Amino acid sequence: MKLDVIKLDGEAAGSVELDEALFGLEPRADILHRVVRWQRNKAQAGTHKVKTRSEVSYSTKKIYRQKGTGGARHGARSAPIFRKGGIYKGPTPRSHAHDLPKKFRKLGLKHALSAKAKAGELVVIDMATSEGKTATLAKQIKNLGWKRALVIDGAQVDAGFAKAAANIDTLDVLPSMGANVYDILKRDTLVLTKAGVEALEARLK
């Protein structure tokens, strides 16, 4: 698969040959769904917690005697049956992460790249460099028509470009090792540098 390469100012900069094994697959929603679910579950904090009857701030004294009152049998006010009592079998802190094989995660990334290529939402630029000025980069992005974009560079992201992009909320920047299915699908446009293409092909071959 051949794709035109452009510069940040919109000028042509030749073309690049993309590996069909990475960018030419028929995207499968089930694979993408499983990988995104794995990512989001792993990222979930899992700090949810409610108080049980032994943790609520109440006396543990029996509220009245067992027999002879005509009322139902009760123990302490902290019982779940009472208002402001403890919660029975409520959520406790835990990890929501689950396993997903490495081969499947790698396959998911290939399908995410292929999905962007098939939808016409893949752009290749020669390099992502900047003098560190947000206004300049924002103007270039506007002229290129990128509404919500993810830029994936090579092993290292240019410091000036990262600084300029930091204040643009519609632009994310990642090194090649940070490329993941969720971030690729979240943004409308996937922008790869030539170094990023080479690094991804080396990582996923």
From Swiss-Prot:
Keyword hit for RNA-binding: yes
Keywords: Ribonucleoprotein, Ribosomal protein, RNA-binding, rRNA-binding
Transmembrane segments: none
GO molecular function: rRNA binding; structural constituent of ribosome
GO biological process, one term: translation
Membership in a protein family: Belongs to the universal ribosomal protein uL4 family.
Function summary: One of the primary rRNA binding proteins, this protein initially binds near the 5'-end of the 23S rRNA. It is important during the early stages of 50S assembly. It makes multiple contacts with different domains of the 23S rRNA in the assembled 50S subunit and ribosome. Forms part of the polypeptide exit tunnel.
Name the UniProt record assigns to this protein: Large ribosomal subunit protein uL4
Classification lineage: Bacteria, Pseudomonadati, Pseudomonadota, Alphaproteobacteria, Rhodobacterales
